[in-house]
Design a protein with these regions (language model features):
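Basic, short loop/linker segments at the boundary and entry of helix-turn-helix/winged-helix-like folds
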Residues: 1-17
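Generic secondary-structure boundary/loop-capping signal
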Residues: 3, 68, 90, 143-146
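Alpha-helical structural motif
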Residues: 12, 36, 101, 145-148
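Short amphipathic helical patch at the helix-1/turn junction of helix-turn-helix
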Residues: 19-21
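Residue-level signal for the short linker/turn that defines the boundary of a DNA-recognition helix
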Residues: 23-25
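Short, basic interhelical loop/turn and adjoining N-cap
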Residues: 27-43
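RNase H-like nuclease fold core
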Residues: 39-131, 135-138
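Inter-helix linker motif
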Residues: 138-150
Length: 150
């Protein structure tokens, strides 16, 4: 692919990101838009970098969630901290152990931001429960409905 073609792919990044949001899969997005995986991945990385550069350390998050997502077969996970209000991902860490939760909470939010969180929603994974009480001592801890309904 020539430079001008690649610039066109990046210029139409919104379409790529919108398609990624719908498919939740880089390979499917590449196929649908007739792009290479590398092109889709580059657009995604640029969007993430742009979002991180816009992050405001003074922004307050009243309600946050800790959750995990399987990324491969065989119980390989990433842990995610996100804003419960709008679903914005604040941080992602490899694994779902205590160290992963510590990385999520201390890297994504300042001490002041964590002190102002009012509620933390988790599933029943022990590391998330421990993280909710350790890193958000002023917040109420709750479980989402998905995990409470039997």
């Amino acid at each position: 692919m020539g430079t001008s073609q690649f610039q066109n792919v990046l210029a139409d990044g919104k379409k790529t990101i919108d398609t990624l949001k719908s498919t939740k899969n880089q390979t499917k997005t590449a196929s649908l838009l007739r792009l290479s995986f590398s092109e889709v991945h580059t657009v995604m990385e640029r969007a993430v970098a742009r979002g991180l550069s816009r992050r405001n350390e003074n922004e307050e998050y009243e309600h946050v969630c800790l959750d995990e997502k399987a990324i491969r077969k065989g119980h390989e996970y990433v842990s995610i901290l996100y804003d419960a209000r709008n679903g914005a991902v604040l941080e992602v860490a490899e694994g779902r152990k205590d160290e992963s939760v510590k990385e999520l909470c201390t890297k994504a939010l300042t001490n002041n931001q964590r002190a102002n969180v009012r509620t933390v929603c988790t599933d029943m994974w022990p590391a998330f429960i421990k993280g909710a009480t350790t890193y958000f001592p002023n917040a109420l801890h709750c479980h989402d409905l998905y995990h409470c309904v039997t």
